[in-house]
Amino acid sequence: MTKTMLRALKGETLPTPPIWLMRQAGRYLPEYRATRAQAGDFLSLCYTPDLAAEVTLQPIRRYGFDAAILFADILLLPQALGADLWFETGEGPRMSTITDMEGVTALKGRDDIHETLAPVYETCRILARELPKETTFIGFAGMPWTVATYMIAGRGSKDQAAAHKLKDTDRPAFEALMDRVTEATIEYLAKQVEAGCEVVKLFDSWAGSLKGQDFEDFAVAPAKRIVSELKARFPGLPVIAFPREAGEGYIGFAEKTGADCVAIDNSVSPEWAAEKVQAGRTCVQGNLDPKYMVTGGEELVQATKRVVEAFRNGPHIFNLGHGITPEADPENVTLLVETIRGK
């Protein structure tokens, strides 16, 4: 097996960690901005396979990352389930809201999502053909809790108050929504794998707002179900899980869910994560602060070396603790890659 990303996901400790970045296809790159302008708007970019494939390939051409991640959005799935989705300039995504069981039952079934998502699968097929042979191809979806927070509130929020309210005041409706999203997520990811994705990543951006038993019930349990069903269909499929800002919840997350790798954010130190999460055997992905992609210089070099050093005694995939920001300097990403690869 020559793909370093897949070797790390199988538990191999490598002298140089594979590297890719969350949101590596993004607004910090001039070529991305040009292609997005060509598409007209963000959703059109997601749903135009040739252009979505192009922006996926751009950071691979520029930096030679070890992995490419499908260009899409976690909110395409709720749109396929029947939610209205639009993006407001400077405000981010907006959706129609689900606040009761009636709203849940009005959603499409898990087998009815594929017509809307067909362009995404075509993007996967294009990339499976066009990516360099050494580049691992990652598909992804949002985790049910995070997707549900948007479906309930109609927008992102700092505290996910609307989702917590539904969870605490109408548990049957909340659990029914989680079930519908979980089932659809499994089918969505299965189609991505059938179309050529070699790895899938589960993004639980708002997992940190789940505490105690709620974290077990609505972050761990859905991840375990998704991982087990996908691995039953695709034996050996590597899965990366990212329960962002889980803190102590990162400990044992891979073991509890069956994920092959746990991605961690930069609110925890690499040394803590190496001891408590990686523990010499569990593949960890992360966790450089994205701010260094803006500031650059010797600070970036030293912070990068610290992350590499912390995780060098176990399987590690180098990434940021969160997505690269539009303010990042493309030259700083070059410096990052050169620092890791010792160029």
Curated annotation (Swiss-Prot):
Enzyme class, UniProt record, top EC level: lyase
Keywords for the protein's UniProt record, in alphabetical order: Cytoplasm, Decarboxylase, Lyase, Porphyrin biosynthesis
Entries under CDD domains matching the protein: URO-D
One record GO biological process: protoporphyrinogen IX biosynthetic process from glutamate
Pfam families xrefs: URO-D (PF01208)
InterPro entries registered for this protein in UniProt: UROD/MetE-like_sf, Uroporphyrinogen_deCO2ase_HemE, Uroporphyrinogen_deCOase
Site (Transition state stabilizer): D73
Subcellular location: Cytoplasm
Principal subcellular localization: cytoplasm
Catalytic reaction annotation: uroporphyrinogen III + 4 H(+) = coproporphyrinogen III + 4 CO2
GO molecular function, one term: uroporphyrinogen decarboxylase activity
This protein's pathway: Porphyrin-containing compound metabolism; protoporphyrin-IX biosynthesis; coproporphyrinogen-III from 5-aminolevulinate: step 4/4
GO cellular component, one term: cytosol
UniProt-listed Enzyme Commission number(s): 4.1.1.37
Binding of substrate, residues: R23, Q24, A25, G26, R27, D73, Y150, S205, H322
Oligomeric and partner information: Homodimer.
PANTHER family attached to this UniProt entry: METHYLTETRAHYDROFOLATE:HOMOCYSTEINE METHYLTRANSFERASE RELATED, UROPORPHYRINOGEN DECARBOXYLASE
Function: Catalyzes the decarboxylation of four acetate groups of uroporphyrinogen-III to yield coproporphyrinogen-III.
NCBIfam families: hemE
Family assignment from sequence similarity: Belongs to the uroporphyrinogen decarboxylase family.
Protein name: Uroporphyrinogen decarboxylase
Gene, per the UniProt record: hemE
